[in-house]
Each structure stands twice: as C-alpha cells, then as structure tokens.
C-alpha cells in the first residue's frame, strides 16, 4: 500500500516529524487542532508571495512557537521588521497566547515539494502549458541534487472537456522504503476551467531515522569447492563420494576386490 498511503504519515516517528508538536487532553484537542488549521490557512494566504514551504507549530507551557520555512525570508520579515511584528500581533490575537515567530530559510527551493507544487499551480493559473511547467520543475530538481521526482496533475488540463490525470517521473521514487526521505506536497490551481490538482513527490536519498539501526555486514562464506564435488550435481555418485548429505553410497567400482592379474587367491 505504499503507492496509496500518505508518504509523510507513513514515515512519522521513523524518518519524519510532526508539523504540530504539542499535547492536549481529550477536551481541548479538537479546538487546538482546528486552531492550527486556521493559523496555517491564514499564513498561506498572508504570505502567498513569500514562498512558504511549511509551518511548524509548538505549544510549550501556555505559549506558542511558530517556525516558518521560507525561501524568501526577507519578504516575511519586511522592511526593518515591520511585517513580522504585524504578523506576530495577529497570531497572538487568533491564538490567545504569547507567540514567538521564527523564520528558517530554505536553501534549495527547487528540491522542496511544496514550493515545486505552488510554482506549477501559479504557472497553470497564468495559462502556461502544464507539460512545460512539470518538465521544467523536474529538470531543476534533478540538477540541484534530487535523486528522483514524480509530478502528477489532474483536472481539465489545457481546458479539455473531460478531466484526466497525467504524471511524469524522473529518477527513483521508492515509496515503500521507510528510510527513504520522501518530500510530498499538494497544491491547487484555480483556473477558469475549474480546479487542477498537483501532487509532487521528491526523493532526496536515504536517511537514518530515530528507530533505524546500523546495518551489520555479513561474514563472507567460504566459497571453496568441496573435494570431488561436481557443481550442480545433487545425485549420489557411483563411487559414493558426491551427492547430497546422507545420500546412499553407490555400488563398488568395477574391478574392486578382484585379484590382480597372474595371482590367484587362496
């Protein structure tokens, strides 16, 4: 079922971590989860031009710590930090607790699945051919170190009457391998013909997670041939030397036990 399950949820606690890191009892869990969803939707709309990859929310001791991963941190911070202060004030009003906002830069946006998906949807909204947008994104990702990438688009592609799905893949994308670092993201393009969905899988190589153990090399076997053994022959030989273990000894060789020429036994 590796082809169907969500790649991030499949690898949680093995090689990936949660995007919301807090604990709540049964009474408050639903409200806090809904609050996280609202915060992420607000940040996605507010920072649409800042190339935000993901948002991590932590809640330590009646506080909130929000980490925003962006390839353009200057757009998030703003001139002299004005935009980040306004953002912090709005988040405190929404969450009702003191909020600390951290900005982390994404060094290689061409290999980030969320940024790739958002870039393709923006091009589709500008009426760029979907095949050109997908292949260009794949070439950039492979050029900057990705070991494999798969992109899928579904909907009324190029304005056709019947919706269809098309996907392209380059390199390896091992979805069943738990130690594989698979970055997965989705995005939607709102066009005049309807919504076009985009899914992106990026394989960045294998990683040792918290539950992975180092691999112990096996001791090499002694591959020397056995004495008088015939390769591939499992049947007992007539002289009784070969064959499978425990095989019945063969008949005596011709001439065995006979007296030598010119001599007679007593």
Curated annotation (Swiss-Prot):
Residues 230-241, 257-266 have a biased composition (Basic and acidic residues). GO terms for biological process: translation. One of its GO terms (molecular function) is rRNA binding. The keyword Ribonucleoprotein applies. SUPFAM superfamilies: Prokaryotic type KH domain (KH-domain type II), Ribosomal protein S3 C-terminal domain. GO terms for cellular component: cytosolic small ribosomal subunit. Residues 39-107 form the KH type-2 domain. InterPro entries: KH_dom, KH_dom-like_a/b, KH_dom_type_2, KH_sf_prok-type, Ribosomal_S3_C_sf, Ribosomal_uS3_bac-typ, Ribosomal_uS3_C, Ribosomal_uS3_CS. Keywords: Ribonucleoprotein, Ribosomal protein, RNA-binding, rRNA-binding. Residues 218-266 are annotated as: Disordered. It comes from the Bacteria. The keyword Membrane does not apply. Pfam families: KH_2, Ribosomal_S3_C. Binds the lower part of the 30S subunit head. Binds mRNA in the 70S ribosome, positioning it for translation. Part of the 30S ribosomal subunit. Forms a tight complex with proteins S10 and S14. PANTHER family: 30S/40S RIBOSOMAL PROTEIN S3, SMALL RIBOSOMAL SUBUNIT PROTEIN US3C. Belongs to the universal ribosomal protein uS3 family. This is Small ribosomal subunit protein uS3. It comes from Burkholderia cenocepacia (strain HI2424). The lineage of its organism: Bacteria, Pseudomonadati, Pseudomonadota, Betaproteobacteria, Burkholderiales. The gene is rpsC.
């Amino acid at each position: 079922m590796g082809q169907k399950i969500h790649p991030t949820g499949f690898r949680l606690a093995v090689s990936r971590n949660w995007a919301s890191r807090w604990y709540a009892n049964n009474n408050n869990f639903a409200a806090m989860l809904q609050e996280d969803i609202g915060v992420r939707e607000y940040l996605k709309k507010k920072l649409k031009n800042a190339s935000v990859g993901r948002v991590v929310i932590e809640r330590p001791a009646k506080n909130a710590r929000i980490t925003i991963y962006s390839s353009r941190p200057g757009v998030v911070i703003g001139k002299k930090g004005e935009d980040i202060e306004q953002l912090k004030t709005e988040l405190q009003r929404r969450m009702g607790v003191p909020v600390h906002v951290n900005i982390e830069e994404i060094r290689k946006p061409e290999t980030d699945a969320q940024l790739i998906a958002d870039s393709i949807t923006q091009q589709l909204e500008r009426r760029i051919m979907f095949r050109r947008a997908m292949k260009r994104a794949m070439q950039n990702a492979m050029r900057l170190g990705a070991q494999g990438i798969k992109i899928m688009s579904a909907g009324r592609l190029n304005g056709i009457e019947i919706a269809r799905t098309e996907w392209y893949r380059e390199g390896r994308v091992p979805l069943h391998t738990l130690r594989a670092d698979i970055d997965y993201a989705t995005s939607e393009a709102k066009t005049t013909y309807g919504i076009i969905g985009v899914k992106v899988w990026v394989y960045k190589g294998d990683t040792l997670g918290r539950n992975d153990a180092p691999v112990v090399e096996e001791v090499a076997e002694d591959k020397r041939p056995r004495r008088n053994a015939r390769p591939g022959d499992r049947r007992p030989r007539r002289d009784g030397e070969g064959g499978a273990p425990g095989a019945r000894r063969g008949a005596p060789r011709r001439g065995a036990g006979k007296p030598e020429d010119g001599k007679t036994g007593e």
